[in-house]
Amino acid sequence: MSRKIRKIEKHFKVFCEGDTEYHYIDEMKRQRKFAISLKPVNMKGGGYSNFLEHLSTDGNTNCLAKFIIIDGDRAINVEGEKDNLRELLEFCNSQNKSGRIPHIVVVNYPDFEYVACLHIPKYKGQNVTQYIINELHYRNLDEFKTDKGVYTVLNTRGNSTEIMLDALHKENCFVIHECKIKKNEYEMKVNMIWNWEKLGRRGSNINEFFDVITSF
């Protein structure tokens, strides 16, 4: 009797800075069907150097690409973090140039909570903390950050990921990636560009994450 050939499952790894991002991605992968599975990893803070340390030893088996989702405000508000961010970007860029597993860095500025507000059609740049409490009916920001159902909250009652994506502007992005995808061959080449003059502008390139995961 012939041996059954095991199908190799490719996946994307998604390294999330904290609980909010992790819960968002984890719930999204359960609700939406993607051709390539998502494997979120909760880094639980630790700054940019924590990402770099983890990525430098992380395995690549069956991994199609790695996404690194970080807040940009640390680079401005925490001493020494700008240099750590530079090292992280240079490491990811070297991985992309070498033809290894693509590393795509998503920088949310100032943070993911701002991106969360963009899911709400009425949001016009108000204070993020107060807006989340008032509009999404949380008692405080910590309750929002630890809510495992945050993806559902941000995609019901008129709120949606699509509204958030429409609100983003490429000219405000600190980092962007040019991705060339060969869908049938499960291959992707990435060119990464960042501009320090744009660090501090409200925005995000999280649209690139959605563009890639829906391209396969």
Question: Model features per residue range: what roles?
Answer:
Residues 38-48:
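Short beta->alpha junction loops
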Residues 2-9, 22-40, 54-67, 72-216:
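C-terminal accessory helical subdomains adjacent to catalytic cores in phosphodiester-
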